[in-house]
């Protein structure tokens, strides 16, 4: 088991933890349908950047 040789200072600990914060994912609104979706992902209706890329009716 690894054991540190010297005690980490509060500053070093906090600087390491500065990248651990959770942030909300960035959402986009589809300009044609108004649907909200993740950036660079297809909307639930199968539309990406104004074009229909997935035909939802063919799967069902």
UniProtKB/Swiss-Prot annotation:
Entry annotated with the keyword Protein transport: no
A Pfam family recorded for this sequence: Ribosomal_L32p
Compositionally skewed regions (Basic and acidic residues) per UniProt: 11-22
Residues that span the membrane, as ranges: none
GO CC term (a single one): large ribosomal subunit
Alphabetized GO MF terms: structural constituent of ribosome
Annotated spans, Disordered: 1-44
Family: Belongs to the bacterial ribosomal protein bL32 family.
Protein name: Large ribosomal subunit protein bL32
Originating species: Pseudomonas fluorescens (strain SBW25)
């Amino acid at each position: 088991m690894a054991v540190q040789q010297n005690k980490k200072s509060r500053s070093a600990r906090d600087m390491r933890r500065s990248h651990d914060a959770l942030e909300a994912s960035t959402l986009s609104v589809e300009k044609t349908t108004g649907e909200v979706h993740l950036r660079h992902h297809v909307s639930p209706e199968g539309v990406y950047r104004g074009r229909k890329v997935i035909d939802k009716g063919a799967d069902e």
